[in-house]
Amino acid sequence: MKEVTLNNGVKMPQLGYGVYQVEPAEAKRCVSDALAVGYRMVDTAQAYANEEGVGQAVKESGIPRSEVFIVSKIWISNFGYERAKQSIDDSLRRLQTEYIDLMLLHQPFCDYYGAYRALEEAYREGKLRAIGVSNFQPNHFIDLASNVEIVPAVNQVETHVFCQQRRAQQYMNEFGTLTMSWGPLAEGRNGFFTNAELIAIGQNHNKSAAQVALRYLTQRDVIIIPKSVNRDRMEQNFNIYDFELTPEEMARIEALDLGKSLFFDHNDPETVKMFMGWR
């Protein structure tokens, strides 16, 4: 398993298992399967309502806690210093762990400065091994990173072959912040799994379109967390380090970039209004 080094020296797997939209009742089974396949990083969030299942699976796996990298996120209803501080303790309890390896702020809305101060404090106390943000576009990210004491280790943003975030990644690199992809398979949108270019490149390596797309991101030094509730698909998503895309193949995939989200634009006022309704 390839590891990446965060800006505070902490190492984390480049490939992990995501549990977005995994039902709480299914989370334990899915994470147990993922750990059995070989995954050693699990990405959850307060808003997913499945932290308990993740914690149970890790605890009952028999794998030392130090060998499983847990990522979670604070939801905007818990932003502000005091609420974020309490929510970190709540996540620790639900995950049945004394520390969380990486804790992120889930969205760039509400009092994220107050919430980030709570992250910094919990980091210094040893409750969090690393801290970061999620869905922060370059304007939000640069503003925050320039005005906090601990620069985010990671920014988790929509990143896949149709929304490649190359410019955003350059800005984050200037701060030593790594890009982490949510939706690395774009939830199958825009004909993802039947894309002729991805299929053709996959045939060169006896790999699927999904495996090619995931490998493309890892070769660009992006952290990925593909999600599947099917163990066979978990295994396919895991087996992406036994081949290398050529520079020519990388360029062909780069040309697939649409330069826009397939989900929502965090700079769109209507998107902000939507999230305000989820507080």
Model regions and ranges:
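Acidic (Asp/Glu)-rich catalytic clusters
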Residues: 7, 55-65, 89-96, 121-123, ...
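Acidic-and-aromatic substrate-binding clefts and catalytic sites of carbohydrate-active enzymes
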Residues: 22-25, 44-53, 77-82, 108-113, ...
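Residues at the N-termini of beta-strands
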Residues: 41, 99-102, 130, 154
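Short, acidic/polar
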Residues: 22-34, 80-94, 114, 139-141, ...
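Beta/alpha (TIM)-barrel catalytic core signal, keyed to glycine-rich beta->alpha loops juxtaposed to Asp/Glu
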Residues: 107-279
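N-terminal binding-site loop/beta-alpha segment at the start of enzyme catalytic domains
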Residues: 1-68, 185, 277-279
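Alpha-helical scaffolding within the catalytic cores
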Residues: 1-4, 52-59, 88-90, 138-141, ...
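Glycine/small-residue-rich loop that forms an oxyanion/phosphate-binding "nest" at active or ligand-binding sites
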Residues: 77-116, 120-121
